[in-house]
Regions:
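N-terminal amphipathic/basic-hydrophobic helices that include classical n-h-c signal peptides
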Residues: 1-11
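Catalytic cores of DNA base-excision repair glycosylases
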Residues: 13-16, 22-192
Length: 192
């Protein structure tokens, strides 16, 4: 969240210039330029998501993003680091005892439900998708515990598609910059 706040602050420095742009595409281009000047690449940041390897493999990315819903990054890191020390595949995660998994991921919100969701998701990937993470938005959304934001993140970071994951922080920035006028993240993602 702190990283999103810093990004928003950088963009907000140039807010008047951005808001004076006549259309949304120009505003998005100006925002991109502003962010590019301040953050040349995401990998160069001190972001704990990157420095702890939470997205270093497609498996890790999917599991950590599923655990991140309704949870701040430090708690996700606290759960994922020990989890990824024990498991490195969907087979290993599925074989892990439910109580052991529940204990490991206890730092994240809704850990009981997420334990169940992860187990079902592993079964779906192994049995319905031949052990491979689905590479379409539609199929990702069929996985237990995967919603729009998680699917968008996977499509962007793992499959290289031009999608944007809109959470409450991104939605707030988009509304402040008058890129969208929406109250629901999914509607904003559809619009942009």
């Amino acid at each position: 969240m702190r990283h999103i706040s810093r990004l928003t602050a950088v963009v907000m420095q140039d807010q008047k210039h951005i808001q004076n742009s006549s259309n949304r595409v120009q505003r998005l281009d100006l925002i991109y330029e502003q962010l590019s000047r301040n953050y040349s690449t995401f990998d160069q940041t001190d972001d704990p998501w990157m420095t702890n390897g939470l997205s270093s493999t497609p498996f890790r990315c999917l599991v950590s993003v599923c655990l991140s819903t309704m949870t701040v990054t430090p708690r996700v890191v606290k759960a994922c680091v020990p989890l990824f020390e024990r498991v490195s595949s969907f087979e290993e995660l599925l074989a892990l005892d439910d109580e052991a998994l529940r204990t490991i991921i206890k730092p994240v919100a809704h850990y009981n439900r997420k334990t169940t969701n992860l187990k079902i998701m592993c079964q779906q990937i192994l049995w319905d998708f031949g052990g491979r993470i689905p590479d379409t938005h539609e199929d990702l959304m069929k996985l237990q515990g995967v919603g729009r934001k998680v699917a968008d993140i996977m499509m962007n970071f793992i499959f290289g598609q031009d999608t944007i994951a809109v959470d409450t922080h991104v939605l707030r920035a988009l509304n402040r910059l008058e890129i969208v006028h929406k109250s629901v993240a999914e509607a904003a993602a559809d619009e942009i």
